[in-house]
Amino acid sequence: MLEAYRQHVAERAALGVPPKPLDDAQTADLVELLKNPPAGEEAFLVDLLENRVPAGVDQAAYVKAAFLAALAKGEATSPLISKERAVYLLGTMLGGYNVAPLVALLDDAELAELAAEALKKTLLVFDAFHDVADKAKAGNANAQAVMQSWADAEWFTTRPDVPSEIKLTVFKVTGETNTDDLSPAQDAWSRPDIPLHANAMLKNERDGINPEVPGEVGPLNQIKELIAKGNQVAYVGDVVGTGSSRKSATNSVLWFFGDDIPHIPNKKDGGYCLGSKIAPIFFNTMEDAGALPIEIDVANMNMGDEIVLKIDHAAAKVTASKDGAVIAEAELKTPVLLDEARAGGRINLIVGRGLTTKAREALGLPVSTLFRVPVQPAATGKGFTQAQKMVGRACGLPEGQGVLPGTYCEPKMTTVGSQDTTGPMTRDELKDLACLGFSADLVMQSFCHTAAYPKPVDVQMQHSLPDFIMNRGGVSLRPGDGIIHSWLNRMLLPDTVGTGGDSHTRFPIGISFPAGSGLVAFAAATGVMPLDMPESVLVKFKGKMQPGITLRDLVHAIPYYAIQAGDLTVEKKGKKNIFSGRILEIDLTEMETDLTVEQAFELSDASAERSAAGCSITLSEEKVAEYLRSNITMLKWMISEGYGDARTMARRVENMEKWLANPSLLKADADAEYTKVYEIDLADIKEPVLCCPNDPDDAKLLSDVQGVKIDEVFVGSCMTNIGHFRATGKLLEKVPGGVLSTRLWIAPPTRMDEHQLMEEGFYNIYGKAGARTEMPGCSLCMGNQARVAPNTTCVSTSTRNFPNRLGQGANVYLASAELASVAAVLGKLPTPEEYQQYAAQIDSMSADIYQYLSFDKMGEYTDAAANVDTKKIAAAQLT
């Protein structure tokens, strides 16, 4: 074991990273060596046990905790670890498998006091709290000491406070840093391996950044030189963290600029992140990780500068100085940030505060005044928006009451989603949280990002992750099933709240607040999520859509109109974005056509590109009911196909049927207040709207970019549904000579869409035209597997067009499937007139083309569903 491990250490050292944490087999071997240590290896073996084994409910932690417990009880011995040291080490394991042994040791005359000291700093005790409380009531003095310590929040007060003044060295990245810059999609396979993945941070050349190996390894030496100055290094940028929700971006930043966590391998917390604008999901993820994110003007901060950051704790104000002169001032988003940073992160603070509250209640003490409390906004006397009412219901407020912007709350998480490039990190976070069962009503795991072209590490993950999720009561999809959102949307309950480890978790019914994997794990484990309620921006569409205009054009009209109003800028320095961090609420009541839920998702999905915190949409009860009837059949079909967890799906079916028995939807009050209201008359949108290379905010009319030569076209992603692929097929029938001059990629969102398109003959059309058909899933959209050729010009229906996302050096226009298909046929962006000639053919067949999958009307699914008794399954206990 030692020889193999040392070889692994050498291999990792060559990559400039520490070894991986020990797994359960290695830990078991280590235990045997510790019982009878080889001469000369003593210190090394102890270091491995103390510092290289994961905590929580990792299987290696189980082996470690069992060994330490056996040492403490005298059931095992080691010449290197005393009983006392074993108890201390149990106290470093955060929670989970270490808790029961420590609680039991409270009755041990020899070790009880040490066990109490260990428990005082342990937050993740969950139901074991009652065991300690019972011992305290029975007169156990050490249990009483633990309860008093928890009540006094010694877990918090013994940690160092955020310094009032600190000297920082600036690591400045100019312009916009998106999460793909910090955690490149092509390296998604390595995300759970935090140190190795961090090597790819900022690997692409850009102004002021000097990667070691451009396109492969980031600016490691540049970072080392700044660290060598002796100050803590702060990550600084004009616009920081836009794009995906991946916590791996935060992990990479903290790996270089954060603080070691004692006894926890390959993870860090703490650190400082300064940005003129910090994207909301990234901001939250930094909070969760124990960093201090500060929105402050960074115009006068440059790479390598030494600045002094002064933090007025009482006023929650920040001052940055350079060479003795003040260069920027700001207020913290909330004073609670200081408590979060001190606690080691927002999740630690929430869990710890809850533990302190429970202990004080048990001891008959008043509520603690130790922690900073968010200032709750005063009632306005006005009504509530749709989103505010949804969150209000999830917080248990009286029906019709909402949560005002600026309010701190913890809404119930009814639905939680996880996908396969964040799922392995979520699994690690769930282990750290000592989670053995989900409290959220439905947690779903997909395999849409890695199924098509998996690496060996992906295949291993695809084999191990489903059972991990299902064993905790979650629902697991299968590789090849398709995109997370296209499935998760079909499991939603109207007017409920949820989250997901993907920034496009944007519910078309209800509302979701996407998050990094740490917060997603917390939401899944506890069933609630912390939220500082955002303000809302309202977009009202009214009138009739013009010929040839698609929903994707309405999606792009939102940034287009905001640019015209001066509320959104494409320039990153001094960036303006009215949607950033706010809820985008979309009112469709004055549109002539009722949108289906599938259509509505195109609008809600793209709120991610606006950097909005969430999105809600007004839909008709009729369309929502149609959708739920279809989804009930789909869920029953899934149960018949052997998907798990069957009990969770059956329970969701029961709740859908309850809604259908008494349908109602929350609506905004007439006097609800919004930060801004945009009214978009559909009569004014007469030509397609695209987003230009390489920024999803850079919305322009087709006439502004017509004639651009196109090399490749992608029709796919969560922004598409079956209607888009039928439209593409109909347009491909018009290809001159029968074969495209462009390279066309086709990737349906789900295997049900693929199957139906094959049944209808569209795959024959795609093949004749020379299109490349991909496995249902994300395909090109994230750019982590298949990619377009370098330096090509493309049209894509995908979500984002950040630099290098779809392909190295690619210039990508975002457009509707209809416009993308015309570009594929013509090999260029058409003129508006050319486009309308093709679009007219689609409009004449629209009733047939834009038919969505109604599973309750499809025999293959209804026959299977008829044999599923969800009431019986939902009532059964988990086995």
Please report, for each region that a protein language model flagged, where it lies by residue.
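Amphipathic alpha-helical packing elements
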Residues: 2-31, 36, 337-350
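Generic amphipathic, hydrophobic interface segment in small proteins and small subunits
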Residues: 31-48
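Short coil turns that connect the paired helices of HEAT/ARM alpha-solenoid repeats
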Residues: 36-40, 73-81, 105-112, 135-139
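Amphipathic alpha-helical scaffolding segments comprising HEAT/armadillo-like alpha-solenoid repeats
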Residues: 24-32, 55-74, 93-106, 125-136
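Short amphipathic alpha-helical segments that mediate assembly, nucleic-acid/protein binding
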Residues: 5, 27, 41-42, 64, ...
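Structural detector for internal amphipathic alpha-helices that build alpha-solenoid repeat scaffolds
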Residues: 15-20, 43-59, 73, 80-95, ...
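Fe-S-dependent hydro-lyases/dehydratases of central metabolism
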Residues: 98, 114-879
